[in-house]
């Protein structure tokens, strides 16, 4: 079996039918012409935000990470492992792709510990066991994995989806693409940066060009490139016609170098 490709989905993608249609059409085309196994890892911040708004609950972030109090983890689990995950499975079904919905704790695929007490139920993901997901891939299934994990003590944790995808890529020896709303990392003039090293990222963070959630994304990608020992791509789902090329290894966004 070829080494798998993990596609991490994020941003408002889950809110846009047009975007999901484009993405799944690209996935179908890619799967028809390549034997390479694919895995989707997703967050769903927009789904969570919408739910929190309906429930009149505050959304608090610290350094770009969502603070998850004990009384909110059940709601966030429902939004990510429930609504967001099943929405993606429904789209896969519509496109005749045999898929299976999972969370990080299934088959101990990704191990999770609490990241920081101040953040509450927010987890740090580390590589786990490849057994379950490899079994599914060998059976021709598309695993769709939410970024909810569980600690050894049985505590549910909300994990940053970029970081969850990195840990799963390390578990499986997979390549990783981080798909988001932006077409890559932009410089101070709004131009896409084709390649990024750790030194360059540090410089842009110091200059205030990379800020907030993008710092988390860039650090996750740098961490992924270092952990995996290979480049990681940050790209946009908006250019559907370019996605098959991206899945084939052609950079269309920003390539993060190890």
Curated annotation (Swiss-Prot):
Pathway it works in: Amino-acid biosynthesis; L-arginine biosynthesis; N(2)-acetyl-L-ornithine from L-glutamate: step 2/4
State the EC number(s): 2.7.2.8
Per its record, what are the GO molecular function terms?
acetylglutamate kinase activity; ATP binding
For the keyword Glycoprotein, the answer is no
Question: Site described as Transition state stabilizer, positions?
Answer: 8, 217
Q: GO biological process: any one?
A: L-arginine biosynthetic process
Q: Which domain of life is it from?
A: Bacteria
Q: What does this protein do?
A: Catalyzes the ATP-dependent phosphorylation of N-acetyl-L-glutamate.
Q: Which family does it belong to?
A: Belongs to the acetylglutamate kinase family. ArgB subfamily.
Oligomer status and interactors: Homodimer.
**Protein name (Swiss-Prot/TrEMBL):** Acetylglutamate kinase
């Amino acid at each position: 079996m070829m080494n798998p490709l993990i596609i991490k989905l994020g941003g408002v993608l889950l809110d846009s039918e047009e975007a999901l249609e484009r993405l799944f059409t690209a996935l179908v085309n890619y799967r028809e012409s390549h034997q390479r196994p694919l895995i989707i890892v997703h967050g769903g911040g927009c789904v969570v935000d919408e739910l929190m708004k309906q429930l009149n609950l505050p959304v608090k972030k610290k350094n770009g990470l969502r603070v998850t109090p004990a009384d909110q983890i059940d709601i966030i689990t429902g939004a990510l492992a429930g609504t967001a995950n099943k929405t993606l499975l429904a789209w896969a079904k519509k496109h005749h792709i045999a898929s299976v919905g999972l969370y990080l704790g299934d088959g101990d695929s990704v191990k999770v510990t609490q990241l920081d007490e101040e953040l509450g139920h927010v987890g740090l993901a580390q590589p786990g066991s490849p057994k379950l997901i490899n079994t599914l891939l060998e059976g021709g299934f598309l695993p769709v994995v939410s970024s909810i994990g569980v600690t050894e003590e049985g505590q549910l944790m909300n994990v940053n989806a970029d970081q969850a995808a990195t840990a799963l890529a390390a578990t499986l020896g997979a390549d990783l693409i981080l798909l988001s709303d932006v077409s890559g990392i932009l410089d101070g003039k709004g131009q896409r940066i084709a390649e990024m090293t750790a030194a360059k990222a540090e410089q842009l963070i110091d200059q205030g060009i990379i800020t907030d959630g993008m710092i988390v994304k860039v650090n996750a990608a740098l961490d992924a490139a270092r952990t995996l020992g290979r480049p990681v791509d940050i790209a946009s789902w908006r250019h559907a016609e370019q996605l098959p090329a991206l899945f084939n290894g052609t950079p269309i966004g920003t390539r993060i170098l190890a």
